[in-house]
Structures are given as C-alpha cells and as structure tokens.
From Swiss-Prot:
Keyword check for Methyltransferase: no
Modification Phosphotyrosine, positions: 929, 968, 1022, 1029
Record's protein name: Probable leucine-rich repeat receptor-like protein kinase At1g35710
Membrane topology: Single-pass type I membrane protein
Residue positions, PTM Phosphothreonine: 848, 1030
Stretches assigned to the Protein kinase domain: 851-1120
Taxonomic lineage: Eukaryota, Viridiplantae, Streptophyta, Embryophyta, Tracheophyta
GO molecular function, one term: protein serine kinase activity
Listed SMART domains: LRR_SD22 (SM00365), LRR_TYP (SM00369)
LRR repeats: from-to residues: 78-100, 103-125, 127-150, 151-172, 175-198, 199-221, 223-246, 247-269, 271-294, 295-317, 319-342, 343-365, 367-389, 391-412, 415-437, 439-461, 463-484, 487-510, 535-557, 559-581, 583-605, 607-630, 631-652, 655-677, 678-701, 702-723, 726-748
Class of this enzyme: transferase
Length: 1120
C-alpha cells in the first residue's frame, strides 16, 4: 500500500468514526431533551392535550419530533420549537429544562394557565427568535436578562399580572420587531432606551400603570407602524418627535393624563390610519395639519379640553370612517366640509360649545350610522337633508336650541333605532312619516313645544322599548298600539294635555319597567286601566282624572318600588293587598277620596321611605304598626280625619326629614320626638292637641319649619327653644300659649299672623301686635287677702332684685376687667373677649407653643391658623398678620372691630363655624374658632383619595348645608350679614362631613388693604361680575359664589372658564355626565336627580344680572 493510499484510508476511517459519534451524540441529546420535557410535563395539573408526549426513560431509543404535539426539531434532531398555545396546561416554570433545551428558537406558550414568575434563565436561550407567554397568569417582574436575547424579534408578554418596571435592558434587543407588554400591572416610566430599537414595528404597552412622560426618543424608531400606550397614567406632553415616524399607522395614547397641545408635527405621519388621543387633558386647538393625514380612518380626540373651532381641512380626509371630537370645549360652527366625508359612519361632536346651524351638507354622508350633535348651542332647524341618511341608526340632537318643525323627511331614515330630539325648542306636530321607523327602539322628544295629536305610526315599531314624550303640549288620545311589540319598557307622557283612557295594549304590556303619566287629563276606571307587570319598578299616574277603586292586583307586580296615584278621583278603601308590597319605597295615594282606617299591617312596608296619604277621608287611630317604618324620610297624613293621640312610638323615625299631621282630629299632648334629629319640617297644625309644648322638641337641631297653630296648646314656650339654631319658620297662632317669646332671631322676626290668638303671649316688638312683656296685671279691688299675700312676696322680690343687680354689676365689672386684661409676664394691657370666658390667653399661647409652625394647619391672605389642644377641647386659633394687627390697633377701627366680633359670636347655626372670641395683645392678635377635623373643602377635593371618600350623598349635603347657612345669615338675622368670600377654601367639614362656613363676616373686617373695607371682596374665580364696576357687595354676590361652589363640588375642581360662559349664557345646557367628578362613581337614582336640580340652580345663581339670581331663602327652601 502506498503512502497516498494509506492516508486516504485513514481519512475515510476517521470520517466514518466521526459520523458514528455524531449520530450517537445527537441521539443522546434528543433523548435527554425528551426526558427533560417529560419531567416538566409531570408538574402540570392538566396536560390532556399532551398525550402524545410518551417515551420510555429506561431505553436509549430516540423519539420522533413529529409525533409529539407542539414540538419541532432542527435537522439534527434537537428541539428548536415549542408551540403549546391554548392547550390548557396549568403549571409553572420552576422545572422548565433550560439547559436541555438550549437550541430553542421558537416558544409559544400563550393562552394557558401558567402561573408564577418568568425565570431569568430564559435570557440564556441565545437562539430564541420568537417568545410568546401572553394570556396566562404570570406574576412578578420582567427579568432584565431578556435584554441578552440579541436575536429575538418577537416578545409577547401581554395579558398577565406582571408587576414592577419595564427593564431598560430591553432596549438592547436590536433585532426586535414586535414588543407587547400590555394588559399587565407594570409601573414606573417607559425606558428611553426603547428608542434604540430601530427595527421595532409594534410596541404595545397599553393597560398598565405606567407613569412619567412619553420619552422623546421613541421618535427614533423609524420602522414603527403600531404604537399603543393607552390606558396608563402617563403625564406631560405628546413629544413632537413622534412626527418623525413616517411609517406609523396606529397611534393610541388615549386614557392617560397627557397635557399640553397636540403637536402639529403629527400631521407629518402620512401613513397614519388610526389616531386616538381621547380621554386626556389636552388643551389648545385641533391642528389643521391633521387634514394632511389622507389615509386616516379613525380620529378620536374626545374628552379633552380642546378649544377653538373644528378645522375645515378635516373634511378633506375622504378615507375617514370614525370622527370623535366630543366632550371638549370646541366653539364656532360645524364646518360644511364634513359633508364631503362619504365614508364616515360615526360623527361625535356632542358636549361642546358649538354654535350656528347644522349644515345641510351633513345629509350627504350616505354611510353615516351614528350621528351625535347633542349638548351644544346649535340653533336653527333640523336639516331636511338628513332624510338622505338611509343607514343612520342613531341620531342625537338633544340639549340644543333647535327651533322649527321636525322635517317629514326624517321618516325616510328607515334604519333608525334611537332618535333623541329632546330639550330643544321644536314646535309643530310629530310627522306621520315616523310610522316608517319599523326598527325603532327608542324615541325621545321630551321638553320641547310640540303639539297636536301623537300619530299612531309612532308605535308601529315592534322593537319599541323606550318612548319619552313628556313636557310638551300634546293633545288628544294616545295611540292604542303603543305596546304592539310587547317590548315597551319605559314610557313617559307626563305634563302634556292627553286625554281619554289609557290604551288597552298598556294593560297587557308585561314588559313595562317604568311608566309616567302624571299631569294629563287621562280618564277611566283605575281598577281596569292597569294590569299585572312582572318587572315594573315605578309608575306615576298622578294629577289626572281617573276614578274607581284601587285594584288589589298591584300586589302581583313584585318589583314595584314606587306607586304614585295622587290627585285623582279614586274612591273606596285601600286594599289590604297593598300592605303586603314589602318592596315599596314610595307610596303616594294623596288627594283622592279614599276612606277607612289604616291597618296594623302597614308596618309590613319596612322599605318605605316616602308615605303620602294626605288629602283623603281616612279616619280612626294611627296604627302603632306605622312605627315599624324606620326607613321613612317623608310622612304626610294631613287633611284626613285621623283621631285620638299621636303615637308616642313616632320617635322611631330616625331618618325622617319632614312630617305633616296637620288638619286632622288628633288630641292629647304632643309626643316626645326628641330622637328625630334629622327632622327639618314638622306640621301638627289644625288639630285638637292640648297641654304644654314639650321642651324635648328643642332637641330637633335640624328643624327648620315648625307649625303648631290652631290647637289648644297652653303654658309657656320652653326657653330651650333658644337653642334651636336651624329654626327659621315658626307658627304657633291660635292656641292658649302665654309668657314671652324665646329670644331668637326666628321668634323676633315672626309675623303677627304666626302669633295671633294667644291671649297670654307677650312681646316688646310692636309689629307682632302682642301685649308688652313688661306689663303687669293690676290686682282686683277689695283684695285684702291678696294684699297680705302679695306684699311679702313683692318685698322678697325687691330684695332679690337688688341682690341680682349687684351680682350682675360685679360680673360686668369682672368682664370689663377681662376685656382690659394684664399679661402675667409683662404686665402689659391686652383686650380679650370670649363668649363664655372659658378660653384663657395663656392656655392658648402654651398649647400652640407660642404659635410654633408645628401647630400650623392653614395659611390665608390675612392670617395663619393653628390647632390648639386645650385640656378638654380642641380649637382653631386664627392669628392675624402684623399689617392687620396694626390696622386694628387704631382706636376707631378697634372699637368697630370689637363690636362686629361680639355680634358674630352670637351666631348660632349648625352650618356656621362657631366664633368663640377674640384677643388683642401687643404681641399677638387672634380669633378663636371651633375646630373642624376634616379641614377645608378645597383641600379634600385636591386630594384624590379624600375626593373619593366625598361621595355624591356627602357633596349634596354640603350644598344643602351651605345653602341653609347663607339663608340664615341673609334672611333670619335682624341685621343681614353678607359673607363676601364664599369659596371652597372657606367651607370646612367635621368628622361627619357636615359642612360649615367659616370667616362669616370677618372677611369684611379683616380686608384692610384699602381705606374702604368694602373695596375688596372675595376669592378670585368666585367674585360676582358686577363687583368689578359697582364695588358694592350684596347678598347676590354670595349667591353667585354659591353657584360656583355647586359646580366645583360636582366637577371636583374649580369650574374655571365654564363659569364666565354660563354667566353670559343663562340658557346654557350642561350634561351631568360630562362634568361630574370621575373619581366618584357615576351618580344614580335619587342622587342623580338631586344633582341635576343642583346644576339647574347653579345656572340660575351664575346669571350675569344679579336681580335675576334667586335669593338664598328660595334656594334653601328648594333644597329642603
């Protein structure tokens, strides 16, 4: 064998050996990988779809990749792909074979039940190209080690429960094209290093808790096509660098806290198809450059603070399908160019300040499905061209100022499902063409000036669920076929002039949930007019002309919560079945001709909050069972024939606000009602009550109106009535009362009519036409026995009078000395006045550590407020600034100031912060107030957590409390007091969230930056507009400020520019949904109704003409 032949032989032998070895190693590797996977599988709770994963671990035979579900191998037999998406596996990565599967390039474990953390060892799989763990239950952090995967192109971790921050190391994955971390619980900021990912096309970070700004470096990702950062907590402005992303097609930044303007550079992104910046805090105008985005199909900018007009250039984007600009502050008219958008299906411009007419060109948008222009200031008529919109299913034009008739052409919109034209000024009749709406589900025409008969065609649709036609001038009979489709749920016909019987189809309309017929001329037998309604929860057919007896079938409507049939001609006894309707919350049968007695079974209605049976012929005793209705808030049994005593158990109505038992035949004494601490109105007049007025009535600290007139009450009026600080209206006439009136503003202002026919009452106020209290009765003649009795008594009285005068002189002298006291340390004089003398100067100085900053709780324009912990109480001490102190030290000013402060200490109202006293010293001058634990309203509203605790119920009570306090100060004082500075900073709350006004009257006293103290009044943003030119402060200035305060409570912050626009436009329409504080759950039920009433009141208060504003008395009465 030659040398060459020998070498060739050796080479072939070595090659053969290497192939044998290679095959052996490969086989060993695949077996090891298989065994490793089987070990991981054994940890799964559920692995039914992996039944093909079978291998005998005791043999060395290889396994076939193709036979294992979801497993693929490379050419050498090593596992490189693991695709187990949606296989239902439930387990963790604790035993995942990272070392054995080092060749993995593709991993898809999405849509399973994997839990636990993502191990950092995944960062060692250097060949990984595709990695998807989305839609699992994974927790913990995203490991920074993933940044080592230089070849990774796709990373999907979305829809898990991952926390912590996004690692900046992810910016090292230079091959990355798709990165989805959305729908987790990630926090922290977006790493600027992501801007290094030049190949990144898709970045999804939406639905997390990310904060901070959007990094400008994201504008470097030139390959980007989809960028979604929505539904986070991002702040700051939108970087103008995003305009560099020429390939970007989708930009979602909605539902963040972004501020600033929309960068005009966004108009450079010519590939853009979907742009959503809605639900942020963006300001400024809509850039006209957006009109350059020729491929745009979606433009969503709603719920921001955008101003200015709608750019006409938007009408050039012919590809536009969805345009949403609602809930902003846009002004001007709707551009007619929008009519060019032939492909537009959705146009939302609602809740702005748009004016002018609706362009007829909008009728050219043939693809339109949903058109909402409501809550604006649009005028003119509804364009007849809307009849061309054959595909339109939703048309909302409500809350505008539209006039004229409803065009017949609207009936051509045969696809219509929901039509709302309510709260405009439309006239004429409802077009007959509405009968073409065969798909109609909801029709709202309420609060217009529509008249004539309601056409039968309105009820043609078998899909009709909601028909709201109230507050118009409709006449005639109502269409018989109203419930033709048996789907009608909500019908409201109230406040029209409809007549005749209720349609028979309504009697059998089992689908009804809510029905209102009040304020019409409907007739017929009430027993036959209505049927049985399984789902009905509210019905009101009051103020009509129904007759007959109440049907017992109402018991068979198991969900009925409110049954209201007042002011009809209903007769007979109340059926016993009514008392079995335990779900009732409101029962109003008032002003009919019902008779009979109330049974004990009335106590079954334990959910009842409002019971009105007044104006009937009911008789007998009031049953004791009534006292079981502990949820009652309003009770009216007046104008009946009830007799016997008022039950003593009435003190169980702890939630009761008003009770009227007047015009009956009740006798006996007034029961003890001391537990009814929420009672605001009590009317027991026109009965046969006798005995004395119980002193316990003075416990009713919320009582605002008390009428005890036309009874047989005798004796003195309890002196404890002087503590009833909320009482503003009293009538005790036509009784047998005697003695002096209580010394309160309410009794001093009481009219002669409210006091007359009480022969023993006395008063020194001439207008009350009572005998003077100083008058003594002369003894009758020949009264020797009387003389012998009276002389010793009068002698004793004279001696006692002398002693009393002497004692009073001493006390006054001590108080005078207290008024000019001496500092125990310096011997210097100081002036101190305290209403009860219990606050000592030295105690206050010591408790505040001589006004150390650690005790500071607030700072104002003229003072600092400190908390002082005294031995038995906590007080607030308002220390005046030195400039104020110097002004007050002037003799003339000081005396006037002291007189005013002393007057203010006499104020007693539960919604006014109590001023205890005042101290003037060379070193310190301060006022002493009661301490309010929750602090000021503005601080609560500025704190998100505190604002959430300030529920709608609490906010409503704040409005009521402030209204009652202002009414008291304006109308119930002998000398009215104007606050001058009503603002959220001057409304304080205690631990129970009871609102009290602070600085009442002191605003005038302490503003001394002008020789005329009236020259400055109020806090910026709350001052009435007329003050700028009159420089006069009146009660109507407080009313204006109160209107601002209402809006502030509803919005959750100062209403800003909205105030001036409402002041200049008294007819302004406001949507509660658009302005209500989003930190509190959306108001519902009674709270929503109360808030709507308060918004209406705020609009009245903000009228530019002060004479057009209501008085605080009328406001307070409305809210009572």
């Amino acid at each position: 064998m030659g040398f060459a032949e020998k070498n060739l032989y050796d080479f072939r032998f070595l090659l053969f050996i290497s192939i044998i070895l290679s095959c052996s190693i490969s086989a060993s590797a695949t077996i090891a990988e298989a065994n490793a996977l089987l070990k991981w599988k054994s940890t799964f709770t559920n692995s039914s779809k992996l039944s093909s994963w079978v291998h005998d671990a005791n043999t060395n035979t290889s396994f076939s990749c193709t036979s294992w579900y979801g497993v693929s191998c490379n050419s050498r037999g090593s596992i490189e792909e693991l695709n187990l998406t949606n296989t239902g596996i439930e387990g963790t990565f604790q035993d995942f074979p990272f070392i054995s599967l080092s060749n993995l390039a593709y991993v898809d474990l999405s849509m399973n039940l994997l839990s636990g953390t993502i191990p950092p060892q995944f960062g060692n799989l250097s060949k990984l190209i595709y990695f998807d763990l989305s839609t699992n239950h994974l927790t913990g952090e995203i490991s920074p080690s993933l940044g080592n995967l230089k070849n990774l192109t796709v990373l999907y971790l979305h829809q898990n429960y991952l926390t912590s921050v996004i690692p900046s190391e992810l910016g090292n994955m230079e091959s990355m094209t798709d990165l989805a971390l959305s729908q987790n619980k990630l926090t922290g900021s977006i790493p600027s290093s992501l801007g290094n990912l030049k190949n990144l096309m898709v970045l999804y970070l939406y639905e997390n808790y990310l904060t901070g700004v959007i990094p400008p470096e994201l504008g470097n990702m030139e390959s980007m096509t989809d960028l979604a950062l929505s539904q986070n907590k991002l702040t700051g402005s939108i970087p103008s660098t995003l305009g560099n992303l020429k390939n970007l097609m989708v930009l979602y930044l909605y539902e963040n806290y972004l501020t600033g303007v929309i960068p005009p550079e966004i108009g450079n992104m010519e590939s853009m198809t979907n742009l959503a910046l809605s639900q942020n805090k963006l300001t400024g105008s809509i850039p006209s450059s957006l009109g350059n985005l020729k491929n745009l199909t979606l433009l969503s900018l709603f719920q921001n603070y955008l101003t200015g007009g709608i750019p006409p250039k938007l009408g050039n984007i012919e590809s536009m399908i969805d345009l949403e600009l609602s809930n902003n502050k846009l002004t001007g008219s709707i551009p007619s160019s929008l009519g060019n958008l032939k492909n537009l299906t959705i146009l939302y411009l609602y809740e702005n300040y748009l004016t002018g007419v609706i362009p007829p060109e909008l009728g050219n948008m043939e693809s339109m499905i949903d058109l909402q222009l409501n809550n604006n200031k649009l005028t003119g008529s509804i364009p007849s061209s809307f009849g061309n919109l054959k595909n339109l299913t939703y048309l909302y034009l409500y809350l505008n100022y539209l006039t004229g008739v409803i065009p017949q052409e609207l009936g051509n919109m045969e696809s219509m499902i929901n039509l709302d034209l309510s709260q405009n000024k439309l006239t004429g009749s409802v077009p007959d063409s509405f009968g073409n709406f065969t798909k109609l589900e909801s029709l709202y025409l309420r609060v217009n000036h529509l008249s004539g008969a309601i056409p039968p065609g309105v009820a043609n649709s078998s899909h009709l669920t909601t028909l709201i036609l109230d507050t118009n001038n409709f006449t005639g009979f109502f269409p018989e076929t109203v419930c033709k489709g048996r789907k009608l749920q909500n019908i409201s016909l109230d406040y029209n002039h409809l007549e005749g019987p209720i349609p028979k189809s309504l009697r059998d309309c089992k689908s009804l949930i809510r029905a209102r017929f009040l304020g019409n001329k409907f007739t017929g037998d009430i027993f036959e007019a209505f049927g049985i309604y399984p789902d009905l929860n509210f019905i009101d057919f009051s103020h009509n002309k129904f007759h007959g007896e109440i049907s017992s079938n109402w018991e068979k409507s198991p969900k009925l919560g409110a049954l209201i049939m007042s002011n009809n001609n209903i007769t007979g006894a109340i059926p016993t079945e009514i008392w079995n309707m335990t779900q009732l919350v409101e029962l109003d049968l008032s002003t009919n001709n019902l008779f009979g007695e109330l049974p004990e079974a009335i106590g079954n209605l334990t959910n009842l909050s409002r019971l009105r049976l007044n104006g009937n012929q009911l008789s007998g005793r009031v049953p004791a069972g009534l006292s079981f209705l502990t949820n009652l808030e309003s009770l009216d049994l007046s104008s009946n024939n009830f007799s016997s005593e008022i039950p003593q158990t009435f003190d169980s109505f702890l939630k009761l606000h008003d009770m009227n038992l007047s015009r009956n035949k009740f006798d006996g004494s007034i029961p003890r009602l001391s537990k009814l601490t929420q009672l605001t109105q009590l009317d027991l007049s026109h009965n046969q009550l006798d005995g004395e007025i119980p002193s316990q009535l003075s416990s009713l600290q919320s009582l605002d109106k008390l009428d005890l007139s036309h009874n047989n009450l005798s004796g003195l009026i309890p002196t404890t009535f002087e503590g009833m600080i909320a009482l503003t209206n009293v009538d005790i006439s036509n009784n047998k009362l005697e003695g002096p009136l209580p010394d309160t503003p309410t009794f001093r202002k009481a009219t002669a009519d409210a006091l007359e026919e009480n022969i023993g009452l006395c008063s020194n106020i001439p207008k009350q036409r009572l005998k003077p209290c100083r008058e003594l009765k002369k003894p009758k003649k020949n009264g020797n026995l009387v003389v012998w009795i009276l002389v010793p008594i009068l002698g004793v009285l004279v001696i006692l009078s002398i002693c009393a005068n002497t004692f009073t002189y001493c006390i006054r002298k001590r108080k005078l000395q207290n008024g000019r006291n001496t500092d125990p340390e310096t011997g210097e004089n100081m002036s101190i006045f305290s209403v009860d003398g219990k606050f000592k100067y030295q105690d206050i100085i010591e408790s505040t550590n001589e006004f150390d900053p650690t005790h500071l709780i607030g700072t104002g324009g003229y003072s600092k407020v400190y908390r002082a912990n005294l031995q038995d109480t906590i007080i607030a001490v308002k220390r005046l600034h030195d400039t104020i102190d110097e002004e007050i030290s002037k003799p003339v000013v000081k005396q006037e100031f002291l007189n005013e402060v002393k007057a203010l200490t006499e104020i007693r109202h539960r919604n006014v912060v109590k001023l205890f006293g005042f101290c003037s010293h060379r070193r310190h001058t301060f006022l002493i107030y009661e301490y309010m634990e929750k602090g000021s309203l503005n601080k609560l509203l500025a704190n998100d957590e505190e604002a959430k605790r300030l529920t709608w119920t609490k906010r409503i009570n704040v409005v009521k409390g402030v209204a009652h306090a202002l009414s008291y100060m304006h109308h119930d004082r002998i000398t009215p007091i104007v606050h001058r500075d009503i603002s959220s900073g001057n409304i304080l709350l205690d631990n129970d969230y009871t609102a009290k006004i602070s600085d009442f009257g002191t605003a005038k006293l302490l503003k001394t930056d002008s020789s005329n103290w009236s020259a400055v009044a109020g806090t910026y943003g709350y001052v009435a507009p007329e003050f700028a030119y009159t420089m006069k402060v009146t009660e109507k200035c407080d009313v204006y400020s109160f209107g601002v305060l209402i809006l502030e409570l509803i919005i959750g912050k100062h209403p800003g520019d909205l105030v001036s626009s409402l002041s200049s436009s008294p007819g302004e329409a406001l949507s509660l949904r658009s302005i209500s504080d989003e930190r509190v759950l959306e108001p519902r039920g009674q709270n929503r109704e109360k808030l709507l009433k308060m918004v209406e009141m705020a609009l009245l208060c903000l009228q530019a003409n002060p004479e057009s504003r209501p008085t605080m008395l009328s406001i307070s009465t409305t809210f009572s």
